[in-house]
Amino acid sequence: ENLRTDVNWIRRLTIILENAKEMLDALVIDGELIYSQPDLRSKFNKQKFFDLDFYPVSLYYLGMTTLKDNYVMVLPNLTAQSIYMNYYNELNQISDDARCFVPAYRLFMDHRKLKPLVENYFKEYLGQFPAQVFDKINENFIRCSFYEVLSRYLSNCYTFAVEQNLPSGRADLVLTGISGTAFHNDCRVVEFKYFKAKDATMVEALKVVRPEDADQVRRYAADINRQFPAYRMRAYVVYIAAGKVCKTWEVINL
């Protein structure tokens, strides 16, 4: 919650709303901010703190980003990611009205099917964005925003991992049932594929999941199951083409 208040520093740093939006685009769409090593090493200067080129280092000083390597900064954890995503939604006037989401999640408690939750996200969350936004967003935005919506309603049932490192690669999203709940040992792996509007017709025409995508998520599920044999694994591939097409396949023969 302390970070929630500190996020208002973005407004102070960027001075105008458009600059704040650009900063958040970099954080929640690209997932990283380029920074200058000399700026990071330089002596603290209050005047420079509000300079446009110094924004990434200013956020680092405020504890709102962390260093990924010698060139870029990233958000420090999933809690920060969720908070920034909430702030992004506020700035872009994206509603989080529970009445649009709760019915789908109540049904999930009965049938445990993930596909309706993806469809709910596509309609009620992505459906609020203007068409031009879909040329800018990417798979990183899709996985992070879907996680943020899921975490509002399923955080008592699952823990979440975004871009989980596995021997076969990085899984976009992993849901793991919490011990002591009815979801214990229920593990879901979700792989997202995002397409621009020009590819919507191609995605719409797909009758089955592409074999290479199914194989990818199978490998991720196998990696997890080798480490945790008691898990009941389920795996999914989600195709989203701008705001036009959404298709979800559950991959079998894990």
Predicted regions and their residues:
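Nucleic-acid nuclease catalytic cores
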Residues: 205-251
